[in-house]
Amino acid sequence: MMMTVLSLCDYTGAWSQPYVDAGYDVVRVDIKRGQDVRLFEALPFPVRGVLAAPPCTEFASSGARWWAAKGEQSLLDALAIADACMRIIAVHQPQWWALENPIGRLRKYLGTPRMAFDPADYGDPYTKRTQLWGHFREPVMCRVEPVEGSKMHLLPASPERAALRSVTPAGFARAFFEANP
């Protein structure tokens, strides 16, 4: 039987790509692909793992200066997406699961993360501190110097900027897959 992995809010598919490459059945659910995690219905078969990356716009500390201007409703909408991810995890009871988000206020709602990392910890030479909650084996680190620094804030304003900032680093995606097949 083919193993299934759910990939939630992973528009780029970068985090789940190692599973696709290894022959897993990866079900990607993302609003930008026309599927809303808040409306996702339980699958009628076992799910081995769940990767969840709810949008960070309302949670990441890098955007804190805009939180007040956006108001409470945008936070409530973002929390509804994170809650939907947690509901999907609870319903499917996978062998492993992880929910990621950059350093920010999501920890106020989910508690202390299981781990935090920078892309440089897994071979990608830049920094972007990211937290993970869940039940999973921690990936083996392969640290390199972050010679590119914090390059995410240097991306020019464009319609693709948010998607580019949200791409899971390839080194981390591969290491996570190897630790959680």
Where are these regions (language model features)?
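Conserved active-site and SAM-binding loop architecture
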Residues: 1-181
